Amino acid sequence: MAAPLAYEQPTFQRSWDAFLLHIPVLVAVWVAGLLVTLVFVAVAFSIYLSLGVFGDASDFALGLASTAVNLAQVPFSILSSLIGVLMVAVPAMYYEQGETVTIGAAFSQLTARFWRYVLAGIFFGFITTIGFVFCILPGIAVALVTPVYVNRIFVTDMSIGDAFSQSFQAVYRSENGMSFLGLEILTGLLVAIATIVTCGLGALVAVPMGSFYLQNAAYKQGLLR
């Protein structure tokens, strides 16, 4: 059972208040993501220097360097994605527990069930990709399940398959599912506008605020319990 505040009417002010409470952990998430990116850039640069520039600079050496960089990108992409998903997971944890999520709590949660989150991300990414490959609309439909799916993965012990199945049914077969989808699309548009007009800086506030709002809305409308 989620905390009582999860079932309050979602508003801009409540999302803003929740955002202010979580500025430390949100900043930590942004910084961690930036550090992972910088480390990857340094690794990629080192690979190109050692194999491409300081090597014989042949087509083979450059091709080998490119392959090595692509392989090195895999773990960094996984780690970056896991850190990024905390933008949704932190609001989920907040409304489920009713307590401000600290930096330690957020990253402890991430490391405690690391492989569960990795596999959940791979599974969701695979399903979404399949949807986009065969037809764009199914891919979009799967992607819109993200707020509910991340919640189920982070705050419950249900299997990955059950979490996806329940999330999909909650969004597309529940009484208030279509209403939630409308809110999700509108929130996404507002976040996009705020990001564009501020040359990206607005995303630092708009993205987490949107996540807090959607988690609150999902609980209020009965998609999450």
Enumerate the language-model features and the residues they cover:
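Short, functional N-terminal and low-complexity linear motifs
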Residues: 54-59, 71-76, 115-117, 132-136, ...
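Short, charged juxtamembrane terminal tails flanking transmembrane helices
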Residues: 1-7, 220-225
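Interfacial aromatic "cap" segments that immediately flank transmembrane helices
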Residues: 5-36, 100-130, 145-194
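Selective recognition of hydrophobic, aromatic-rich stretches within alpha-helical transmembrane segments
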Residues: 63-97, 128-162, 195-225
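Short, small/hydrophobic-residue-rich motifs at membrane-helix boundaries and re-entrant hairpins
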Residues: 2-97, 125
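Outer-membrane beta-barrel domain signature
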Residues: 37, 41-44, 49, 134, ...
